[in-house]
C-alpha cells in the first residue's frame, strides 16, 4: 500500500463574515487562489499531472453550488482533463476530502491530488435553506440541530463552568494574536486580495477575525446566546463566523520523490465515527481514540493536537476525556483555534491540519493529531507524522 504524504499546506487569511475583508470576494475565487498558489509553490508538478481535486464545502448553493471544486479549478486554469469533486461531511468536509484523496493514493488509483475546502459564511449563511425533516424528531432531539444547545448539553454533562469557558476562549484569542505577532502564521497564510473598511482593495496576510483585546473578564459580561435563562455558552465562547479557504498538496511518497519534492508530513492513520447528535461536539473523542488505535498509539504519544474549537463548552469535555486537561498549554491549539480564527465550515478540516503541520515543523514534533466535531453527531480525526 502506498504511503501518503503532505507536500504542501496553505490557507487564506480568515476574514470576518460580517462586512469583512472578503465581503466582495467569492468563495470560488478564494479556492482558485489557493489552487494556483500550490502549483506556483511547487513548480516541479505539472497541473495536468493532478489525478483529482477533492474540495470540502458545506452550504453547496448560491456561489458555492454546482460543484464548487470544479468551478474553482476552471477559474484556476487547471487543465480541463483534471477532474474535481465537492465533498460534504458538514464541519469535517475538508478533512474528509483529505481522507478521500489519501485512500485513492493508498490503493494506487491516484498519485497526486489537490485537497482543501472553503466556506464563505458571509455570502452563504450556515442555515441558508436548511429544512429538517419533521420526522427526525421521533429519533433525535429537536435541539440536536441547534449547535449551541448541543454545546450547552455537553457543558452540563461534564461540569464545564462559565468561568472555564471564558478562560479558554480568551486563551484562544491571546494565543492566536501572539502567533500572529511572532510571524508563526506567515508560512501557512497566502496573501489574498480583499477590501478594507473603506472599500479600498488591499492585500491581506493576517487573520482579521482575532480580537487581541479579549480577556476572560470581558467575556464574563456577555449574555448566554442559546439558552438565555440557564445557559453558559456565549457568542464570545463560540467559534467566530468567518470566510476562508485552505488547501493541501497530497501525493504518494514515491511520486513526491520522483518529482524532487520534499514531503512535509505523512498520514499515519484516519478515522471517522458517529455519536449522539444531541452532543455532536463529543465526536472528537471516539474519532481520536479510533485513529490512535489504528496507528498503534495512545494520546500520550502525540506531541501536538489541533482540535477544532466549535465552542469552549464543546472542546473542554473532549480534552478532559482524552486525558489532556493537564497538558493544554503544552500540546493543544498552541496558536489558538476557531474561537479566535473562525470556523468556515468547509475549510476548517484542512485549516487545522495545515496549522498543525506548520506547528509540528516549527517545534520539531514527530506526531500530531487533528480532529473535529461534526454537526448532527460525528467526529473525524487524522494522525500526522513528520517525514
From Swiss-Prot:
Reactions catalysed according to its record: an acyl-CoA + acetyl-CoA = a 3-oxoacyl-CoA + CoA
Single GO molecular function: acetyl-CoA C-acyltransferase activity
Compartments, as annotated in UniProt: Cytoplasm
Pathway as given in its UniProt record: Lipid metabolism; fatty acid beta-oxidation
Keywords: Acyltransferase, Cytoplasm, Fatty acid metabolism, Lipid degradation, Lipid metabolism, Transferase
Main location: cytoplasm
Name of this chain's protein: 3-ketoacyl-CoA thiolase
Organism annotation: Cronobacter sakazakii (strain ATCC BAA-894)
Upper lineage: Bacteria, Pseudomonadati, Pseudomonadota, Gammaproteobacteria, Enterobacterales
Amino acid at each position: 500500500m502506498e504511503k501518503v504524504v503532505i507536500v504542501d499546506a496553505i490557507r487564506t487569511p480568515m476574514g470576518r463574515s460580517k462586512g469583512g475583508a472578503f465581503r466582495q470576494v467569492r468563495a470560488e475565487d478564494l479556492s482558485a487562489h489557493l489552487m494556483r498558489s500550490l502549483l506556483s509553490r511547487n513548480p516541479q508538478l505539472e497541473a495536468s499531472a493532478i489525478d483529482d481535486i477533492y474540495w470540502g464545502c458545506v452550504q453547496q448553493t448560491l456561489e458555492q453550488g454546482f460543484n464548487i471544486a470544479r468551478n474553482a479549478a476552471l477559474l484556476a486554469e487547471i487543465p480541463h482533463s483534471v477532474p474535481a469533486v465537492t465533498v460534504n461531511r458538514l464541519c469535517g468536509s475538508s478533512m474528509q476530502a483529505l481522507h478521500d484523496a489519501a485512500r485513492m493514493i493508498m490503493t494506487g488509483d491516484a498519485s497526486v491530488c489537490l485537497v482543501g475546502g472553503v466556506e464563505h459564511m458571509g455570502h452563504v449563511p450556515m442555515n441558508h435553506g436548511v429544512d429538517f425533516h419533521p420526522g427526525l424528531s421521533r429519533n433525535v432531539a429537536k435541539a440536536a440541530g441547534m449547535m449551541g444547545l448541543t454545546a450547552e448539553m455537553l457543558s452540563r454533562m461534564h461540569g464545564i463552568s462559565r468561568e472555564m469557558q471564558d478562560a479558554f476562549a480568551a486563551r484562544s484569542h491571546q494565543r492566536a494574536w501572539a502567533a500572529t505577532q511572532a510571524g508563526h502564521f506567515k508560512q501557512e497564510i497566502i496573501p489574498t486580495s480583499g477590501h478594507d473598511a473603506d472599500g479600498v482593495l488591499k492585500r491581506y496576510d493576517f487573520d482579521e477575525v482575532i480580537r487581541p483585546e479579549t480577556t476572560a473578564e470581558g467575556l464574563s459580561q456577555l449574555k448566554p446566546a442559546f439558552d438565555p435563562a440557564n445557559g453558559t455558552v456565549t457568542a464570545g465562547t463560540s467559534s467566530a463566523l468567518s470566510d476562508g479557504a485552505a488547501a493541501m498538496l497530497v501525493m504518494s511518497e514515491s511520486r513526491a520523490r520522483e518529482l524532487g519534492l520534499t514531503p512535509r508530513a505523512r498520514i499515519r492513520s484516519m478515522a471517522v465515527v458517529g455519536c449522539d447528535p444531541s452532543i455532536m461536539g463529543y465526536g472528537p473523542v471516539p474519532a481520536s481514540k479510533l485513529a490512535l488505535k489504528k496507528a498503534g498509539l495512545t494520546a500520550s504519544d502525540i506531541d501536538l493536537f489541533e482540535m477544532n474549537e466549535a465552542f469552549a463548552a464543546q472542546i473542554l469535555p473532549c480534552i478532559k476525556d482524552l486525558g489532556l486537561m493537564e497538558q493544554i498549554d503544552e500540546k493543544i491549539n498552541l496558536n489558538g483555534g476557531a474561537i479566535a480564527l473562525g470556523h468556515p465550515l468547509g475549510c476548517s478540516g484542512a485549516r487545522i491540519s495545515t496549522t498543525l503541520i506548520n506547528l509540528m515543523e516549527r517545534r520539531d514534533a514527530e506526531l500530531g493529531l487533528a480532529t473535529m466535531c461534526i454537526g448532527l453527531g460525528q467526529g473525524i480525526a487524522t494522525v500526522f507524522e513528520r517525514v
